[in-house]
């Protein structure tokens, strides 16, 4: 169990997984237990901490910082959005370009409390036919109509990039100048593996036990970035896992869309998500 509030390992990855499901359907047609919010945010420090690992964990967002922006990158996807602890909400978006046909799918999920909406937009589609026609509005989903309800995001804590589980799995942490940290993470730890991707971690073999990372903490004591430099293994190329948090307390607050901005999801939306 981590010392700071976190999202369940893989929260962002499930959002990317839902996007992958939509892409697969489009082309055919044309984590561990939830964390707690019991930790406290960090405070700025100008001198090295006696325990750098605990100092870095204390910088992971815990829900007391207000709404903030995030972005994330793993082996297969890039995501960005907003986390709003007061609304128990997340807004996340991913954009993926189809290498064969050249069009881009931009998919967004909005979660507020127990409700969830989806929005899908295709760009660069000139000359293409067979793409699904969906409303250009937020489509509210009924989770009971999803084959796998866990394939779509839910609000499970503020650390949607799973920085906490990764830092917790660090075997060495050293504090550098300018609030920068560096060390080594053992990705075979269960929660860290779920956060980064269990298949990707398994492919690393013994190298998964010695993955270097760097992290930066802002002047306000809050984590601003965490980067894992994942080495090449077998036929897999080296890649980076990146989490960035920004605009603590100043990001837009989230709320359920109303009026003409939303509608119930049509049958086609469920067909896409259910594959």
Predicted regions mapped to residue ranges:
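Bacterial N-terminal signal peptides that target proteins for export
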Residues: 2-19
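C-terminal motif of bacterial Sec signal peptides marking the signal peptidase cleavage site
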Residues: 26-30
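Subset-of-secretome marker
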Residues: 3, 32-275
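Short hydrophobic/aromatic segments of transmembrane alpha-helices and their interfaces
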Residues: 19-20, 206
